[in-house]
Amino acid sequence: MAVNGTAADLRVAGRGPTIWLAGSPDELREWMPLGIAGIVTNTVVLNQYAKPYGSVIKLIEAYLEITDKPVVMEIDGHSVEELLEVGKVFTEMSDQIILKIPCSVNGLKAFAALKTEGVETFCTTVFSLTQAAAVAQAGVDHILPFCEPVKEVGGDPTRLIRECAQMFGDRQQRPLIMAALVRTVETAHAAFRDGCDELVTMWTVYR
């Protein structure tokens, strides 16, 4: 999916910060028609939700059946080559699929390679402003600062969102800031207040 495609256009064309959901296909079916921007997965929930479907591929097919919105697929690998190979398997399934890759040296290299191909990407496990700056320069389109894990160790869950919003400002080519691991309505409120462009949460919090 091209960088200037569906997901990247949502912030400009939409009515405010976009809301993305996590959950199983059956859990999300009810909520997707209510203006939800897309579905976001991670490796933990993929393994959990895939069991009833028999495989991750079958699970992704089930997500694609319930929505025509983007489905963000987290991938992992021990090398840049493995990340690109795994990513290709999923992006060839549907134009709706967008890749999410953890922040790492291999991730930086994968983002740069995918940028040259016009493939839209999300960067997860972002815990510092310097990481956000580095992956932005590598070409990532969506940066996911983690909120609740910071709160659990006594920190400000949305500080990094504020810092990213200030750093990127109104730069035309800046990545979108997605508040991630948002487990309470209070944290969602703070993330919107502090400038996130997007937010992903479980359907139970959205409800």
Question: Where on the chain are the PLM-derived regions?
Answer:
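Active-site beta->alpha loop and helix N-cap motifs at the rims of alpha/beta catalytic domains
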Residues: 2-3, 15, 22-117, 147
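Glycine-rich beta-to-alpha transition loops that act as phosphate-gripper elements at the mouths
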Residues: 20-25, 77-81, 101-105, 123-130, ...
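C-terminal alpha-helical cap/extension of soluble enzyme domains
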Residues: 24, 168-207
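Catalytic cores of alpha/beta
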Residues: 26-34, 82-86, 110, 128-138, ...
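Glycine-rich phosphate-binding active-site loops on the catalytic face of alpha/beta enzymes
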Residues: 38-39, 43-48, 125, 142-153, ...
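Histidine/lysine/aspartate-rich catalytic loop segments that bind and position anionic ligands
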Residues: 126-160, 164
